[in-house]
Amino acid sequence: MASIYRRSSVLIALFTVTICHAHAAPVTASSDFFSPEGRVVTQASYPTDETSRQTLQTQSVVGVNRFQHNRKLTPTDDQPVVRMNRDTYYSRAVVDVSEGATITLPDIPEGKYMSVQPVTEDHRIQPMSYGPGTFELATHTGSHVYLIVRLDATFSEEEAARYQDQMSITAASDKMFKAEPIEPESFEQIETELKAKTPMLVKRDGILALRGGFTAPTDESRGLHDEDKYQIMAAGGWGGAQWKDNIYEISGTYPSDVCHQATFEDPANSAFWSFTVYNKAGFMFSDVANVSSDTATSNADGTYTVSFVCGQDAPNNLPTANESGEFTLAIRHYQPSDRVREEGYRLLPFVKPR
């Protein structure tokens, strides 16, 4: 009798596993990614799950080994990720690198910004490559990478489109990316929990809060990797760049009806710096959402003043009124200077009420 019971238990277990595997059949379309029968998301799995979601979204629009070009700077009604910006035009692609692949970027005028950043299936961030050229693509895991190409925002839309159309991908394989479906409620819960940890991170680590969140296991950034930051930043800033490529400053909240200003010395980054205004949840709410060293007017002494709801005559003024009643800031240093990266020079401490 015991023998029969054991065999029955084994059969039941096998049957259960079979049912679970049937529910977890990999999908290639974003519309199939969330399923009530999908795998439950954990904080440990979230970076990979969010990367799968982003990858499937792009693949569902343009397929594999093809670009999805944003012909305009990020509009307020199309922000798939928190803390997007209008610092650059974006192009995205899902590339099958299983049998080798390259991306080719065109010649652009000297002094203009263009970069490509590969993101692996587990949201490990490879270093950027800059300017024109052909760049090899590879990954330490899986078969696909997600590419983020950034192009200088000072180009007109017509100029940007012309350069975007000269970008090309060459790949020896064109298999679609596949991902295991996930259970939506657990995804939303974990994402909310991780985003809520960002203020704690900033309070605890100060100017080093985001260091270690965007790294790769295949280069020198591996030594900076921090598992907690890796999970938190996948929710709070998916697709962010390595420390050597971009340094981010994320603020707390400010009242949206109080004038604030920051006057500071130019950090002299190799590319540029920028301020972007968001609502409390981290989304842009105005078409006038940012100012950068490429667009800001400097003071007579060479410093810069950036203003927030201080009146039209205030230097480099940005609106802050939004439904949440509060605003937040993200300051970005593209190709940060040694003063920023090594000496800890930051602009956020200069933001003060007036």
Predicted regions and their residues:
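Gram-negative bacterial Sec-dependent N-terminal signal peptides
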Residues: I4-H23
